[in-house]
UniProtKB/Swiss-Prot annotation:
Coiled coil: none annotated. It comes from the Bacteria. Has three domains with a flexible linker between the domains II and III and assumes an 'L' shape. Domain III is highly mobile and contacts RuvB. This is Holliday junction branch migration complex subunit RuvA. Belongs to the RuvA family. The keyword DNA repair applies. It comes from Coxiella burnetii (strain CbuG_Q212) (Coxiella burnetii (strain Q212)). Residues 1-64 are annotated as: Domain I. GO terms for molecular function: ATP binding; four-way junction DNA binding; four-way junction helicase activity. Keywords: Cytoplasm, DNA damage, DNA recombination, DNA repair, DNA-binding.
């Protein structure tokens, strides 16, 4: 099991990034909550990792801190929640907001995440509440001050939202509603998700 990787970011395009470690490039899938903390390409970063091995693929997931990774591991243990949905949850609502929803049994907010129906939301609360009540974190992602290395932040943001399960029309409508094309892709995604999932 690979516990963490320290290396240089070669490229990043949510939800994927390429990390070079000792001359080897690792393709890593990460939630948007992690992307909010990433430096620019060619800078060094430490990512906590979780490797999932299947017959057709070995997928390496990366996280900004151990709290995010523990939450991801708790999510994939829930009946009906696989890695893709777990990633969508962390991307769509953020680790701290998810914990808040679970502890307060806010089913209505959870079902606004793409791929999460009412039954899944109820299982998330039932199966993770006790564990999450024992966890505490002060790590709150913030998109402020982050820059995108891509020259097409709007298109990148729309593509990232589609990768999370939103329809093309929904993604474009959410990005267009922000009306700030000069923002980075990460910030556009964050604001769009806040609008679609949290309703603010």
């Amino acid at each position: 099991m690979i516990g963490h990787l320290r290396g240089i970011i070669v490229e990043k395009q949510p939800p994927y990034l390429l990390l070079e470690v000792a001359g080897v490039g690792y393709e890593i899938t990460a939630p948007l909550s992690t992307f909010y903390h990433l430096p620019e390409p060619q800078e060094e970063i430490l990512l906590y990792t979780h490797l999932i091995v299947r017959e057709d693929a070995h997928t390496l997931y990366g996280f900004h801190n151990d709290h995010e990774r523990r939450l991801f591991r708790a999510l994939i243990k829930v009946n009906g929640v696989g890695p893709k949905l777990a990633l969508a949850i962390l991307s769509g609502i953020g680790p701290d907001e998810f914990v808040h929803c679970v502890l307060n049994q806010n089913i209505d907010q959870l079902v606004r995440i793409p791929g999460v129906g009412r039954k899944t939301a109820e299982r998330l609360v039932i199966e993770t509440k006790d564990r999450l009540s024992r966890w505490h974190t002060n790590d709150t992602p913030s998109p402020e001050g982050l820059r995108s290395s891509n020259t097409q932040p709007t298109q990148d943001a729309i593509s990232a939202l589609m990768a999370l399960g939103y329809k093309p029309q929904e993604a474009k409508r959410a990005i267009d509603a922000i009306q700030k094309p000069d923002l980075s892709a990460e910030t556009l995604i964050r604001l769009a998700l806040k609008q679609m999932v949290l309703g603010t």
